[in-house]
């Protein structure tokens, strides 16, 4: 792999969603507090509940006193006053666009009945994902003892969110949220700066620095590529956007994507013992892609073993 450009960040990871390759890393396994990146897992479980029919986007949920308190003094914007009722869609968008802590807690209570039960679900899902270093203590990311993760594992949550529930981008890509006649711009400066960026979440904590999970989709060679970047330890909100954009730009300009096999393409056969046919075709239901350094595509010779 070619070396990435100089990125003013303590750690990062860049993932190509189509080829399922990691293109670049720096200290991806360092322990970090997840801060508001916690909301990626919160969002995953909410979309999972919607997908399972446990609640609907148009359902309304109350902003409890506990949810409202989560936003007070946290540095995150509050979405609504205690006692207000908002739809699941509004709460999801508030969490995505504004990083609203009260929205995260209200959604947790709406999905699981209580914050404690929701946090238990978060940690079970982390185990399902195979995450070894991630522990959640709340759904919004406020600093508490025992809440921890790594850039690699947070990036994997982002990848799974996009893979399993791509409809989440409907809320993450919004440049602003209008609620009660008040318009509030997204706190994701990169989304406002780069039209190819359509998510995901920004965060800040003393031990984390300015961090973000970002995703971008750009047309390349007649198709589209989606990249996911997770960057931690930048010195400011502006630097967070600038350095993440630099990493994404390199991911697109430094690599070509080669299609090894098309979806449904028969690439070999397997013999069948005493079957109605003597053999069956072998292939993949999805296209097989690989990202290679720019200019090296002609050297790729796919083989099946």
Q: Predicted regions span which residues?
A:
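Domain-terminus/edge residues, biased toward the C-terminal soluble/receptor-binding domains
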Residues: 132-135, 143-305
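Active-site-adjacent loops and short helices of periplasmic peptidoglycan-processing enzymes
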Residues: 1-152, 159-165
